[in-house]
Swiss-Prot record:
Active-site residues per Swiss-Prot or TrEMBL entry: D25, K134, C167
Organism: Escherichia coli (strain SMS-3-5 / SECEC)
Catalytic reaction(s) noted: (Z)-3-ureidoacrylate + H2O + H(+) = (Z)-3-aminoacrylate + NH4(+) + CO2; (Z)-3-ureidoacrylate + H2O = (Z)-3-aminoacrylate + carbamate + H(+); (Z)-2-methylureidoacrylate + H2O + H(+) = (Z)-2-methylaminoacrylate + NH4(+) + CO2
Name listed for the protein in its UniProt record: Ureidoacrylate amidohydrolase RutB
Its EC number(s): 3.5.1.110
Induction: Up-regulated by the nitrogen regulatory protein C (NtrC also called GlnG) and repressed by RutR.
Pfam families linked: Isochorismatase
Amino acid sequence: MMTTLTARPEAITFDPQQTALIVVDMQNAYATPGGYLDLAGFDVSTTRPVIANIQTAVTAARAAGMLIIWFQNGWDAQYVEAGGPGSPNFHKSNALKTMRKQPQLQGKLLAKGSWDYQLVDELVPQPGDIVLPKPRYSGFFNTPLDSILRSRGIRHLVFTGIATNVCVESTLRDGFFLEYFGVVLEDATHQAGPEFAQKAALFNIETFFGWVSDVETFCDALSPTSFARIA
C-alpha cells in the first residue's frame, strides 16, 4: 500500500514493502567517545539524539514491513581490504592516517571483531534484518547491496546514520546513479566535521540527488491513518 512522505524539495510517494531503511555505520567508531572519529579529532558529543531517532525510525519501518539494512564500515585486522599505497583510500582514510600517526591503534580502529567496529549497544539488528560489511564509503562498492535490493523489487531507500557528508551521501549518490530513489532523514544523521558539512550534504541531496525529511514525518507517513488517507 502506498504512502506519501512530506519531504524537501517535494513530497515523495512509495510502498513501504518495496522500500528499505538503510542504517549507515552506526558503530562505536563513529558515534561513541573513544571511537575512531573521536580519536581522529572529530566531535561525537551530539550523536546520542541521533541514535534515539534511528531507534524510532527502525521501529516504525519494521512495523510497516520495510527491510532494514545495517552497514558496518571497516576492514580485516591486517587492513588488506583497506588497500595499500596504490589505493587512494590508503591516503585519504582518516582512520588509516590516524593509525599511522599512532601505531598503538593498529588493529583497533575499524577492524572487524573490534569494539570500534561493533554497532552501538542501543542499535541491535533483529531476525529478518540484513547486516552488510562495506570496505569503502559507498555501500554499493564491493557489496551485494544492489542485487539484494533488486531481487526484492526495492527501488526506494531511506537513509539514516553517520556520517551524512561521507558514507550516507556517498551511498545515496551511488543509488541515484543506479536508479534508486533516496531519502535522508536529517535528524537521524550526523556529520563528520563542522555543522556546515551537514548543511552542505543535505543541500546537495535535496537539490541534486534525492529528498530530505525527518523522523517524526517519516513515522507519521507510516502510520495506519496515513495509509487510510492514501487509500
